[in-house]
Amino acid sequence: MATLQQQKIRIRLQAFDRRLLDTSCEKIVDTANRTNATAIGPIPLPTKRKIYCVLRSPHVDKDSREHFETRTHRRIIDIYQPSSKTIDALMKLDLPSGVDIEVKL
């Protein structure tokens, strides 16, 4: 038996600000649902933490250090059975500049 492979769009989002990321995910899911496509997600992925250690003093004191950290929050949204209306609506969607988007067909 031959099974038909479903069409799927996978959208991967990254941002430093979690609230920006969540609002972007809501916009994408609402847009997909309005065009009669099935949206699954947002699926949260593990948060990446990058810690930087910096010396406080410009001279000798090696004991005095300061730590800074960046957190990268990530989400995945799968859209099944997309139509041409779905793709056009997603292309016209205006998302904040702090959100990194990667789309795979």
Swiss-Prot record:
Assembly information from the UniProt record: Part of the 30S ribosomal subunit.
Protein name in UniProt: Small ribosomal subunit protein uS10
Family: Belongs to the universal ribosomal protein uS10 family.
Upper taxonomic lineage: Bacteria, Bacillati, Cyanobacteriota, Cyanophyceae, Nostocales
Name of a matching Pfam family: Ribosomal_S10
Keywords, comma-separated and alphabetical: Ribonucleoprotein, Ribosomal protein
Biological processes per GO annotation: translation
SUPFAM superfamilies documented for this protein: Ribosomal protein S10
Its biological purpose: Involved in the binding of tRNA to the ribosomes.
GO cellular component: ribonucleoprotein complex; ribosome
Listed Gene3D superfamilies: Ribosomal protein S10 domain (3.30.70.600)
HAMAP family: Ribosomal_uS10
PANTHER family listed in its UniProt record: 30S RIBOSOMAL PROTEIN S10 FAMILY MEMBER
Molecular functions per Gene Ontology: structural constituent of ribosome; tRNA binding
